[in-house]
Amino acid sequence: MYVLENGDPQAPPVLLLHGGGVAGWMWRPTLDRLGGAARVIVPDLPGHGNSAGETYRSHAETARALAEVLEERAPRGALVAGFSLGAQLTTLLAATRPDLVTGAVVVSAQARPLRFPGTTLGLLSAAAPLARQRWFARLQAKELFVPAELLDDYIRDSALVSRATLLASVGENIRFTLPAGWSRFENPALVMVGERERTLMRNSALDTHGALPGSRMISVPGCGHGIPLQRPDLFAEILAEQL
């Protein structure tokens, strides 16, 4: 798994986990605003970006690989923040390896499985070739609130995502339920959701918050499914507060 690390080696470590269909570059606006407040660890998840050569297989396998990254780069633990698919992985890491997670920021994690995942995945498989078309990638980028300066990154990486990675990652995403260990996580946890996200996502945030006593929840006004890209200023400020 490709991992980018930068920032002050003596600063508190932060592991940032991107969403599906994008890559570590989605955190660039946040990093620009975070400055030297953190030592940032940014992987490209399997099947994405610079890790496109590795097929995404499952959340469990990816969480184990991320735990190995933390064992090597932040053995005393790190603040873990994830968006969408990356937010699901954040809850999984917190549940299974709380010794490596000093705090969790869970942004827009779906925590209620879809009723008919097979139908969704069938349609997705049929539409997969469209991801390699620039016009379609541009439409998707708009839905994901990708800013103009990151559009080329999105178009490039969309074409790199294999059908196997697409189906595996989305399949895991739409079947996801909160791991049992999440309710026992003892370190600080913040759940975030956009005020304009779908009802499913807002309810998922309530579930995630409700399942963990002592967690906090923020609904961000004016935001859809794209808080780190829509409000990188706010997101960087929140990360700095969690350190």
Which sequence ranges carry the predicted segments?
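Flexible "cap/lid" loop of the alpha/beta hydrolase fold
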Residues: 91-96, 100-131
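Conserved HGGG/HGGXW glycine-rich cap/lid loop of the alpha/beta-hydrolase fold
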Residues: 2-52
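Acidic catalytic loop of the alpha/beta-hydrolase fold
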Residues: 196-200
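Conserved alpha/beta-hydrolase catalytic His-Asp/Glu region
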Residues: 115-117, 131-183
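Catalytic histidine-centered segment of alpha/beta-hydrolase-like enzymes
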Residues: 223-236
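Short beta-strand/loop motif that positions the catalytic acidic residue
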Residues: 185, 191-193
